[in-house]
């Protein structure tokens, strides 16, 4: 699933919390495989905000991980008929999403 999410045409990058910056599709996708293989906890996207700039979109959201929250930025580009991720960055935040019953319907990231 992670392989399908990331762009195969544009340069990609990722900064996981506490990690150094990763560049290049192979390193980024392998980092996610490693996280998932390690029994990564469920991550839920909460309160996403989408900013559309033609064939590029930025999504800001909270990531809920075992009751704690990170703040994340995800950047997507349009490739043919699909949106593909080109950048992900998540880190600690003091904030947290408002209790919104609709946010429970947001899809799980992994």
Regions found by a protein language model. Give the residues of each.
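Solenoid-repeat scaffolds in large eukaryotic assemblies
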Residues: 1-2
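A beta-strand edge to alpha-helix "cap/lid" segment located at domain peripheries
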Residues: 7, 12-110
């Amino acid at each position: 699933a992670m392989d399908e999410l990331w762009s195969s045409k544009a340069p990609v990058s990722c900064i996981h919390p506490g990690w150094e910056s990763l560049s290049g599709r192979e390193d980024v996708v392998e980092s996610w495989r490693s996280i998932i293989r390690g029994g990564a906890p469920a991550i839920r996207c909460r309160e996403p905000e989408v900013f559309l700039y033609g064939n590029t979109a930025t999504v800001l959201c909270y990531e809920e991980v075992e009751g704690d929250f990170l703040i994340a930025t995800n950047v997507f580009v349009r490739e043919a008929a699909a949106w593909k991720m080109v950048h992900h960055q998540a880190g600690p935040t003091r904030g947290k999403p408002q209790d919104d019953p609709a946010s429970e319907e947001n899809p799980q990231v992994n």
